[in-house]
Regions:
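Helical segment within the ABC ATPase nucleotide-binding domain
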Residues: 185-197
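Conserved ABC ATPase "signature" region
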Residues: 111, 115, 122-141
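Conserved ABC ATPase signature
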Residues: 145-149
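Catalytic Walker B motif of ABC-type/P-loop ATPase nucleotide-binding domains
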Residues: 170-173
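Conserved catalytic motifs of ABC-family nucleotide-binding domains
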Residues: 166
Length: 272
């Protein structure tokens, strides 16, 4: 693949979910509606949006967990929906809904993942403590069962697991949700290091505007499944004649992050 070719190429990607209401009627909601964008190797792109905007659906589609209803997506030249096994070897995903063996410890979960990725015992024994330390996971709790850890602690283990193989494309779905300020800063620092040391391409889906502005080269805004823009933050501010991303969100959507959501928004959140 040419170095000038996109790392991620999404064209008119759509996903519609149905939800039964009553005995017969099904309500259909578009979690994504004709979304298109590209990413270059080594780039970090942040997708902003409220809950239910379609961010998680986008991540699930690119990580081969869902099939699209329309459109195409390619990761380093491979068709996400026709060549899922090739794509899976290039992608690691961190999500707020990360699953673990709850009775096993953080170290045991990572060791299991390492074996799955084909890492040998010596490399596993060396790498796991280093990664856990880098994401700010305390050494005193590495042997503790996952079910006894807070959501924030589990999120750190999810990030560590995704970084075991130095992924080419890292899909981060709210990676710092549930973390205290210090842990959040540690994870953000580690994301920067991974990007620059391993030339990883990063898609960061978040509702944290400050996080997006600090970490990303370009910022996109998903609202009710529509990608309203995706461009450098200064271009976004200039486009709308504003000084902050929050003002840009208001200018683009006519509402603020704090506005009450409609029934349609709440129903869309079930899917997106």
């Amino acid at each position: 693949m040419s170095s000038s070719s996109p790392a991620v190429d999404v064209r008119d990607l759509s996903k519609v979910f149905s939800r039964r209401k009553g005995l017969v009627h099904r309500r259909r909601r578009a979690a994504l509606n004709s979304v298109s964008f590209t990413m270059h190797r080594g780039e970090c792109v942040a997708i902003l949006g409220q809950n239910g905007s379609g961010k998680s659906t986008l991540v699930r589609l690119l990580s081969t967990l869902l099939l699209a209803d329309a459109g195409t997506a390619h990761v380093f030249g491979h068709d996400v929906f026709k060549e899922p096994r090739k794509v899976q070897r290039l992608v690691n995903r961190v999500s707020v809904e990360a699953s673990f063996f709850k009775k096993m410890s953080a170290a045991e979960n990572l060791a299991y993942a390492a074996r799955f990725y084909g890492m040998g015992p010596r490399e596993t024994h060396t790498k796991i403590p280093v990664i856990l330390e880098r994401v700010g996971f305390p050494s005193s709790r590495r042997g503790e069962a996952m079910e006894n850890l807070s959501r924030g602690m589990q999120q750190k283990v999810a990030l560590a697991r995704a970084l075991l193989t130095s992924p080419v494309l890292l899909l981060l779905d709210e990676p710092t949700t549930g973390l205290d300020p210090r842990s959040k800063q540690e994870v953000q620092t580690f994301i920067r290091e991974i990007r620059h040391q391993h030339d990883s391409t990063i898609l960061l889906c978040t509702h944290d505007m400050k996080e997006a502005e600090e970490l990303a080269d370009r910022i996109g805004l998903l609202d009710a499944g529509e990608l309203l823009f995706i461009e450098p933050v200064e271009d976004v501010k200039e486009r709308y004649g504003v000084e902050t991303l929050e003002e840009a969100f208001f200018a683009a959507t006519g509402r603020t992050y704090e506005d009450e959501r409609t029934e349609d928004d709440e129903e869309r959140e079930v899917f997106a």
